[in-house]
């Protein structure tokens, strides 16, 4: 396992248990340190308690999801790298972060994560 991956902390924010836990297990096997939250409120707690390198978040969640969650991330997490996953959003929607559309292949997710973590800029 790559030491550089282990040093990266990824926060997965996903309200569907099966998806959240599958993503967690996949990224753990790839060597990342992974935190999870089931909604935006839980994610805020994780962000307060831990240093996070990348947020991988669903767009549509019942509790603090959707446009309010995106606005929160854009306003209060300006130095945070964020990747949105969604089966709901369309390319024409104005989202200030990169979006990976569901259903997606895990290798595409892994590539996008690696690109964001290698990028020295934000978002």
Descriptions of predicted regions:
Residues 1-9, 105-123:
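Non-catalytic signal-transmission and effector/linker regions of two-component phosphorelay proteins
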Residues 16-35, 106:
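Two-component/phosphorelay signaling modules centered on CheY-like receiver
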Residues 20, 62-63:
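The feature encodes the CheY-like receiver
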Residues 36-45, 66:
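Helix N-cap/capping motif at the beta->alpha junctions
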Residues 45, 67-78:
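Short amphipathic alpha-helix used as the core "switch/output" element in two-component signaling
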Residues 58:
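Active-site residues of response regulator receiver
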Residues 84-86:
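Hydrophobic/aromatic residues positioned on beta-strands within the core alpha/beta folds
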Residues 102:
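A Lys-centered signature of the CheY-like receiver
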């Amino acid at each position: 396992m790559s030491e550089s991956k282990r040093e990266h902390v990824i926060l997965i924010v996903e309200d569907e248990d099966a998806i959240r836990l599958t993503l967690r297990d996949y990224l753990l096997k790839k060597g990342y340190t992974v935190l999870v939250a089931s909604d935006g409120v839980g994610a805020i707690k994780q962000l307060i308690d831990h240093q996070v390198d990348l947020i991988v978040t669903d767009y549509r969640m019942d509790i603090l999801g959707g446009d309010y969650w995106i606005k929160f991330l854009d306003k209060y997490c300006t130095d945070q790298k964020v990747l949105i996953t969604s089966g709901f959003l369309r390319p024409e929607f104005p989202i200030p972060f990169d979006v990976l559309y569901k259903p997606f292949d895990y290798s595409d997710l892994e590539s996008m994560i690696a690109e964001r973590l290698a990028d020295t800029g934000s978002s």
